[in-house]
C-alpha cells in the first residue's frame, strides 16, 4: 500500500491506495477522524449516520436503495466512537456510478424534520429492545461508572432522553463539523493509480466538505475500584469489568502478549482455565486489552449462574491479582507466541483483509508493516521482560465492576 494525496481542496488529504486485480472489485472509504460519537452531543453521530440511510432530498430511501441494489453496490455511512465516514464496496464496472450516488448523498442529505422524527423513533425503539439484552446493559452500566461525566460513559445510541432532545440544528451542526483536515481516503482493489475519472469524482465528493482545522481526540482514563449492580429477572448473572492500563507505545507488544495469556486467548488462557474449567463458575470468561486513541484499558466479561456470581467475581479478582504478583510461566509464553504467530496469516487471507490491516496501521500513526514487526518482537520476548512488565502494571487489578443479575445487592 502507498500513500498518495488529494490537493487543491484547502490542504492535503491522504489517499491510501492499493492495486489488486485478483478480484474485479473496489473498496472505497472516506474516514473523518476525531468525528465519532465521543466527539459530539450524545447520540447525534449515530442519528446522523442513520439519517444518511434514508436517501437524498430528491431520491427517497426506497428509490435510492433500489438503484444501488440492482447493481449490487454496498454504500453506507458508518459511525464509531472515534470516527465517522462512508464506505463503498462494489464491482469495478459500477464504481463510478457508486461514487456518483455518494456525491448525490453528501450534496443533498435527507435532513428533514420528517426523517429526523422517523429515525428518532427507530433509535428509541432499538434502545428499548436492547434494554433486555443484559450483556449490553452490563457493558453500558460499566462505562457509566468507569467513565462517569465523560463522553465515554455513553454508547453510540445515547439514552432515550438524549435522542428525544436532538434537534435538526444539532444534525446540521454535526454535519458541518465534518472537515477534511481530519479526513483520509482509502481506495483499494482493481483500480489504477492514475485513473483520473475516479480521482476527479472523489475530489468532487471531498469538495462538498470544508477543509477546516484538524481536531485531536480527547483522552480518557478508566476509574478504578468501583462497583454497580442492577437487579433484573434473569437466569444468569452478567459481569463486566475494566481497569486502566497505562501502557506506553513501545510496550504495546508486551501488553498484547500478557493480555492474551491472562484472558484473551479463550481456552488455555488463565481466566478461562481457572474460572470455567477448574472451578466451573462461568460459561465463559475473557479479558483483553482495549487500546484506542481515546483510552487504554483492560476490559473483560463473564456469564454465570446467579448463585455463582459472587464466587466467580472473587475468583476473577484473585486470578488477576496472582497474575500481577507472580507473572506467567515459560510454557504460557511459548504457547502464546505459537498461537499469535500461527494465527497471523489467517488475518491476511483476502486482499481486502490485508488492506484493512494497512489502513488500521495508518490510522494508528504507524508505518505499514508495523504489525509484522510487532510480531517479531513478540517472538523474541523473554520471560523476565514480560513478568517485569506485568508486575509494573498492577493497575489492571483495580477493577471497576458492573453486574446485572437476579441477586439482591447484599448477596454480591
How does the language model describe each region?
Residues 1-64, 172-274, 313, 398-412:
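His/Glu-rich zincin catalytic helix
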Residues 63-213, 245, 278-279, 284-412:
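Charge-rich, well-structured scaffold segments of protease-associated domains
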